Amino acid sequence: MLLKGAPVAERVLNKIKQEISNSSTRPGLAVVLIGNDPASEVYVGMKVKKATDLGMVSKAHRLSSDATLTDILKLIDRLNNDPMIHGILVQIPLPKHLDANAVIQAISPEKDVDGLHPINMGKLLLGQLGGFAPCTPAGIIELLHYYEIPLHGRHVAVVGRSNIVGKPLAAMLMQKHPSTNATVTLLHSQSENLTEILKTADIIIAAVGVPLFIKETMISSHAIVVDVGTSRVAANNDKGYTLVGDVDFNNVVAKCKAVSPVPGGVGPMTVAMLMKNTWESYKKSSS
């Protein structure tokens, strides 16, 4: 079975669009882009367009690659204090001279729709309500729920320990809630006995950032595999590259119980959860 993200994202987004159409005012999403990284330009354009399509007011705020931390903090402060803005997203990665943590911490937790502010991360770890969850982990759990894949008591192996995916996803999966409550093993590319552990997992989340890292020899035939990675690999086509995930899809798909494709799996879910967080922020500010 293929775990395609498009129908799941469509269900989430249609609900948001309907609710926005019944609202007297529109939520606002500000997307901050520093520099001119081509991939980041594509992602920013996609997020702004999706928000606009849903009926939100969305704008990209662009700063040059030599922008100082002071420049960025001034912009964020202005957006924090703008009552028409309900969500602020700073596109990562940032130019190397900038402190990403300082930028993220400058965003008001109430407008941190990426869910990366330490306060929102802390609420997530403590199991407290009211914060925003990071979009990709939230999207993964939504994807699994849509396909009626149970998590309660299951062994989930998360390969990757980033602050954006691996760590928050592990915390979300372990929450004492009937819809999660999984037994989680958090791994990385240098973990000892990696294959031995993965073969015991009911669900494998690959978020290690290494193309084709998870091979069919590393999983069991009953495994459900979610591929978070996206990498460009040289190919003999018009683009000169092809997109692949962290999973060796062509071989894994023949062995596992279910797998998410790249592209078309987790990607649409990340954007959908960003829109959901922005809408939730708007509703909180209006209540």
From Swiss-Prot:
It catalyses: (6R)-5,10-methylene-5,6,7,8-tetrahydrofolate + NADP(+) = (6R)-5,10-methenyltetrahydrofolate + NADPH; (6R)-5,10-methenyltetrahydrofolate + H2O = (6R)-10-formyltetrahydrofolate + H(+). GO terms for biological process: L-histidine biosynthetic process; methionine biosynthetic process; purine nucleotide biosynthetic process; tetrahydrofolate interconversion. CDD domains: NAD_bind_m-THF_DH_Cyclohyd. GO terms for molecular function: methenyltetrahydrofolate cyclohydrolase activity; methylenetetrahydrofolate dehydrogenase (NADP+) activity. Pfam families: THF_DHG_CYH, THF_DHG_CYH_C. Gene3D superfamilies: Leucine Dehydrogenase, chain A, domain 1, NAD(P)-binding Rossmann-like Domain. InterPro entries: Aminoacid_DH-like_N_sf (IPR046346), NAD(P)-bd_dom_sf (IPR036291), THF_DH/CycHdrlase (IPR000672), THF_DH/CycHdrlase_cat_dom (IPR020630), THF_DH/CycHdrlase_CS (IPR020867), THF_DH/CycHdrlase_NAD-bd_dom (IPR020631). One of its GO terms (cellular component) is cytosol. Keywords: Amino-acid biosynthesis, Histidine biosynthesis, Hydrolase, Methionine biosynthesis, Multifunctional enzyme, NADP, One-carbon metabolism, Oxidoreductase, Purine biosynthesis. It comes from the Bacteria. NADP(+) binds at residues 160-162, 189, 230. Pathway: One-carbon metabolism; tetrahydrofolate interconversion. SUPFAM superfamilies: Aminoacid dehydrogenase-like, N-terminal domain (SSF53223), NAD(P)-binding Rossmann-fold domains (SSF51735). Its EC number is 1.5.1.5, 3.5.4.9. Belongs to the tetrahydrofolate dehydrogenase/cyclohydrolase family. NCBIfam families: PRK14181.1 (NF010778). Catalyzes the oxidation of 5,10-methylenetetrahydrofolate to 5,10-methenyltetrahydrofolate and then the hydrolysis of 5,10-methenyltetrahydrofolate to 10-formyltetrahydrofolate. Homodimer. This is Bifunctional protein FolD. The gene is folD.
